[in-house]
Amino acid sequence: MSLLPVVMALLLTAACAYQPDAASGDGSRELTVFAAASLGNAFPEIADAFVAEHPGASVTFNFAGSQRLRTQLDFGARADVFASADRRQMDLAVEAGLIAGDPTSFAGNSLVVIVPLPGTTAELNSAVKIQRLEDLAGNGVKLALALPEVPAGRYALALLRNLEAQYPALEPGYASRVMDNVVTLEPNVRGVFQKVALGEVDAGIVYRTDAATEYAAGKVQVVSIRQ
């Protein structure tokens, strides 16, 4: 499903449902969007396109981990759109009566392992060079993951377990050995990316979209998971 038209439709629906007493006298609409941190690149561009097509509208973003956003909503924060990175947090929001209508799936993503780009200061200062998945379980490796409470962290652990089960080259206990090398758990996937880009860790697991931006191209590279 294409990201642009679906998110545009979500914003338009929110604008139509906007409470009249919250609108300014000139008929403008200010929409508040709570979105997973991994959407921080795509959503502002979509919002710009939406505002261009709907004069008088404006969009304000709150980007954070999906679990944190759902908790904020649970404690009374107001939002017109909640874009979660996983179904679990959306289901919890629905169960709590925080969501109007039925949730819509608008995009998919995948996880990748990133390391500092060769030749950068971060890579040159790294004592460990990660070239294969096996290397993540080596001695002295420093790995960054997102907190297990947020989707990226939960998905990363599932990825490691799945890799161990699917690839014979990864010996039994691989996932546990990799987890032993985790030195920081970040509140969202953007934090993981920054740790790698700055050379504070040797590798991290992030969404593919985070590694595909123009900014990322000059900072990190993706380690192939093909064995």
Predicted regions span which residues?
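Short, structured active-site "lid" loops
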Residues: 77-85
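Active-site-adjacent helical/loop segments in soluble small-molecule enzymes
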Residues: 110
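Central helical "cap/lid" subdomain
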Residues: 97-104
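Exported/periplasmic ABC-transporter solute-binding proteins
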Residues: 16-54, 58-67, 71-74, 86-87, ...
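Bacterial N-terminal signal peptides
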Residues: 2-15
